[in-house]
From Swiss-Prot:
Shows particularly broad specificity; although bonds involving phenylalanine and leucine are preferred, many others are also cleaved to some extent. The lineage of its organism: Eukaryota, Metazoa, Chordata, Craniata, Vertebrata. The active site is at D93, D276. Residues 16-59 form a propeptide. This is Pepsin II-1.
Amino acid sequence: MKWLLLLGLLALSECIVHKVPLVRKKSLRKNLIEKGLLQDYLKTHTPNLATKYFPKETFASVSTESLENYLDAEYFGTISIGTPPQEFTVIFDTGSSNLWVPSTYCSSLACFLHKRFNPDDSSTFQATSETLSITYGTGSMTGILGYDTVKVGNIEDTNQIFGLSKTEPGITFLVAPFDGILGLAYPSISASDATPVFDNMWNEGLVSEDLFSVYLSSNGEKGSMVMFGGIDSSYYTGSLNWVPVSHEGYWQITMDSITINGETIACADSCQAVVDTGTSLLAGPTSAISKIQSYIGASKNLLGENIISCSAIDSLPDIVFTINNVQYPLPASAYILKEDDDCLSGFDGMNLDTSYGELWILGDVFIRQYFTVFDRANNQVGLAAAA
């Protein structure tokens, strides 16, 4: 009997899911609107999702990443770096691969308005001579790379490389609700070839399975979760459907089609899609998105937002994304976002033709509806209806 109990405890210990709560806060866009700064901001900082993906096909620098594209991000988690630990609020971003935070090396105003990592206060920090540069808008975040203990939930990684910012020009981060970014994509797109956090977790034997999963709650600030090393079936209904990763860089998959009332409105001959927790909206080619906006009756306001009548939500159809022969319907309650007295379309246009064809981004609008597993061991994405 004792042996059976011991074996049971061992089996349980091998499948521990390390959960990190995410909090839903006001996005950078909302903060700018409340301060009356959005119009001025958009004059000099144009969000363009195309700059985040496949930079080598779009720009000269391999480390280009448009930080304006976090304008609508709403889900954030807490990590700590150093000994004793220094806490930071970060975006857990499956659309990038680097971890970086502001540091005391940085004298930009944006850094002073956020938590800054002080390497002098950490007994375990190890400096390097390597640099990091992430270009965005009219300037760039520059910094250095160092090693230290990074704690994510109850996972303590004692040898994680990360970026310490030295400059953060512009106003992008002045009212940003987060300090830094923790990338969860593949190492092949990591700037300066820095080992991503999850890769290090797996390499160091800190997680029992080479996968992580994400649940984004639709209700209230709390309840969202990123889970490392396992899957908690209480966060979804039915069974997981698995989709092969079509290219190992981003979490990129092949999508069969997009339909409304049985009519194909986009992606007629299949297309590529990136599942990205760091993108709030659902994005695709401008021409296709314009067609969808017209279909649902959305029109732009003075701030460039796509507004729709809130009274129309109940009469709007599902938009169906077919992936690996499985249909994933998005009801209007999912793709129409209520903002105080306004209702906004959850779709955004971008133009980026890659060597893989047209690209779509399945951001938080999609992930809120479908619990998502990012399986590195088998290079696949699992999807199931969120509980």
